Amino acid sequence: MDLVFLHYNEALRLDPKHRGAHEYLGEAYLQVGNVAKAKDELAALDKICFFPCSEYTDLKAAISQYEARASAK
């Protein structure tokens, strides 16, 4: 998983507004249980997308699903 974070962070270093990298990085954070970092990526997408974009919508849904599963335990 470390390589995933390394590569997505490098993609964002090269292009800080790359919506796909923010979405996938947020989803990767969810896979390791770091909801706060996933929400940071969602906030970044909120600033980048002038109108709701699919990357924002998809990450928001993934976070909601993650939180619903966590609260159901």
Question: What does each model-found stretch correspond to?
Answer:
Residues 14, 47-51:
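Structural marker of alpha-solenoid helical repeat scaffolds
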